[in-house]
């Protein structure tokens, strides 16, 4: 019975995410939220931006369906997602982005119980490393499924590993994976959407 209820919840969440992504595309098209390719891009045509916002929708839906179990982590994720989406639609100074990234990393450390300022050097190194990893995604071209494919290659093994050694609520991993699958459905289809900052930095 519980398994059936879980499957029903997953189905509802998947449907909501799909509708949310389609609605976002209409908004992006209406307000001209687009990416014009440059020399670093692997695509050659103007493409809609910001479809990776579905990842943020997924995090919100997880909290709505399964409870606010990881408040600091989710808050940090939303902060990064919000500033990254702003980067898609307007110019944001790098220092402001870094401030948000550092604050989000502090929230992540707080969530997992590592925010102990007696070990400030560990925290400093961790923040710099994690922020660097986040921004590596920024150098991936968000079209043709590159970032989404890499992200699935991380999330799926995490789900399998979590079955053996429970370190996080499996529902969070499953909901986020569904978000990526929906994004990839559009992202692998060229010309429809480009991921860009919202997904890249939130991931």
Write out the residue ranges for each language-model feature.
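"…together with the soluble PPM/PP2C metallo-phosphatase catalytic core" -> "…together
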Residues: 2-203
